[in-house]
Amino acid sequence: MEKGLTLPQDCRDFVHSLKMRSKYALFLVFVVIVFVFIEKENKIISRVSDKLKQIPQALADANSTDPALILAENASLLSLSELDSAFSQLQSRLRNLSLQLGVEPAMEAAGEEEEEQRKEEEPPRPAVAGPRRHVLLMATTRTGSSFVGEFFNQQGNIFYLFEPLWHIERTVSFEPGGANAAGSALVYRDVLKQLFLCDLYVLEHFITPLPEDHLTQFMFRRGSSRSLCEDPVCTPFVKKVFEKYHCKNRRCGPLNVTLAAEACRRKEHMALKAVRIRQLEFLQPLAEDPRLDLRVIQLVRDPRAVLASRMVAFAGKYKTWKKWLDDEGQDGLREEEVQRLRGNCESIRLSAELGLRQPAWLRGRYMLVRYEDVARGPLQKAREMYRFAGIPLTPQVEDWIQKNTQAAHDGSGIYSTQKNSSEQFEKWRFSMPFKLAQVVQAACGPAMRLFGYKLARDAAALTNRSVSLLEERGTFWVT
């Protein structure tokens, strides 16, 4: 038998041992690799899980992500593939949600911050808080406010109130002195705010006699507000029920305050005229109230014309003036009468100066209008006022203006709103004694200069139609 080459026993043992060790080494390397892979996988799962756990439940609800995709019932982690899928889905929906909410990515957010900073450095623009406007026609008696108020009363989508603060003046009394004006202004302002919010019930505390079951026959000048005399506010007429201030063109039952408040809320806009708001600064809380979008139109008129009109309309209050005019002697007018006239002019002037200074809270919310400009161009001024208020002017209002400003004769009564406006506004010049005009010019000089009313040097200039007592003014009246 042939003998082959054989390795020594020691070598064979060594080779066999090496093979066995190699197998164990390979197995050990495999185990280490698997262990490292599992550890990495666990770390990834842990990070994803932590991310998911940190997301508020509200966001999951907001973007309709199923919570079951995030955590299992037993709070254990799902497989990596399921978690990756859930996390990707959630991330996508969060992105969509952020876009819907106006939240931009970091770079876009930084751009927005720069844009906001740029806007803050720009002058404030006219307020555009919302579609509903709250227009206040701020005036004094005998300035033509009833006539100008009709520009808003005749528009069907505006709820208009005529002098609602009249009831407060008749009911609330204040101590005489300097606090009187401030105290009354605060009450007027607070009532005004509630009225703009269509809380007409606030008037029930001031109407005399007190309304019963929200019904009253004593709403001041109800007939001057179309909104209070149209359906459904105009309820069936009740026989033998006397209504002091009744509707003009139809017969209605007592005013139902609840129905009036509901009608106010249904209208697109709200407007009212008030001759008892004297200090513009008291309206700042209303201008800053987020529930309101206030527009103030201050109506002024030549103080000489105002006094001439008041002496006719309120003759009983001006007996002292008439006696002074009729007195051929040298006795002067009582100083307290002149001081009262001067105080009225100054309060009007100070409010106008505040509005024209354009403080931030009033910017875009104030307009100064001269009655003389309205009388000379009523349709043009109506369009300007509506543009300022942010309300479209309807043909209905334009037709009313055309018909009621070109009448052959002024309407009857001292409160008539039917006028030949282009001729009417200067009638006072031919009936006022020059010495009365001199008193007004001396007491109201600063206000007259601000509003562009020229002084009459003598009686001839006062009655000369070819001599204008009105300066032409530009568009600076709107701020």
From Swiss-Prot:
Residues 39-479 are lumenal. SUPFAM superfamilies: P-loop containing nucleoside triphosphate hydrolases. Widely expressed in adult tissues. Expressed in heart, placenta, skeletal muscle and pancreas. Also expressed in various immune tissues such as spleen, lymph node, thymus and appendix. Changing residue 304 to Q: In SEDCJD; loss of chondroitin 6-sulfotransferase activity. One of its GO terms (biological process) is sulfur compound metabolic process. Gene3D superfamilies: P-loop containing nucleotide triphosphate hydrolases. The chain crosses the membrane at residues 21-38. It is a single-pass type II membrane protein. Glycans are attached at residues 63, 74, 96, 256, 420, 464. Keywords: Carbohydrate metabolism, Disease variant, Glycoprotein, Golgi apparatus, Membrane, Signal-anchor, Transferase, Transmembrane, Transmembrane helix. It comes from the Eukaryota. Residues 1-20 are cytoplasmic. Sulfotransferase that utilizes 3'-phospho-5'-adenylyl sulfate (PAPS) as sulfonate donor to catalyze the transfer of sulfate to position 6 of the N-acetylgalactosamine (GalNAc) residue of chondroitin. Chondroitin sulfate constitutes the predominant proteoglycan present in cartilage and is distributed on the surfaces of many cells and extracellular matrices. Catalyzes with a lower efficiency the sulfation of Gal residues of keratan sulfate, another glycosaminoglycan. Can also catalyze the sulfation of the Gal residues in sialyl N-acetyllactosamine (sialyl LacNAc) oligosaccharides. This is Carbohydrate sulfotransferase 3. The gene is CHST3.
